């Protein structure tokens, strides 16, 4: 079993969105990916930590960085907070960061490097 997360806004977004999904100001993660502040949506997702399948799922977390630690829409800190939700329950957890103009949020799914990484992860080709 494998799962790919691409440009996930787990800890929230920094623009005008409902407060429940807005990223808290000055968000930081500890070494386990745990945010120093959590919005309501993240608190709900964090409750799933104890029921996430143990040692069954390989996880690939793809993030983009066009500069400034963001893909232009989702701050990297928000995407990286997935680590805490999954905790140490995943069979494996890997982050792949892509940089440059083709790492923009809306372009990640069209990025040839991302495609190669997905093919390798999902089908070992």
Indicate residue ranges for each PLM-predicted region.
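Serine-dependent carboxylesterase/thioesterase catalytic core
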Residues: 1-54, 71
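C-terminal catalytic-base region of ester-bond hydrolases, centering on the histidine
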Residues: 51-125
């Amino acid at each position: 079993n494998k799962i790919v997360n691409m440009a996930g806004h787990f800890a929230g977004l920094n623009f005008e969105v409902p407060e429940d999904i807005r990223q808290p100001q000055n968000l930081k993660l500890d070494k386990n990916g745990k945010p120093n502040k959590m919005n309501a949506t993240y608190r709900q997702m964090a409750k799933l930590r104890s029921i996430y399948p143990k040692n069954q799922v390989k996880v690939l977390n793809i993030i983009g960085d066009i500069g400034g630690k963001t893909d232009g829409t989702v701050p990297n800190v928000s995407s990286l907070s997935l680590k805490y939700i999954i905790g140490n329950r995943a069979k494996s957890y890997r982050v792949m960061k892509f940089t440059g103009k083709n790492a923009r949020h809306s372009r990640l799914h069209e990025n040839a490097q991302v495609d190669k990484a997905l093919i390798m992860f999902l089908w070992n080709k």
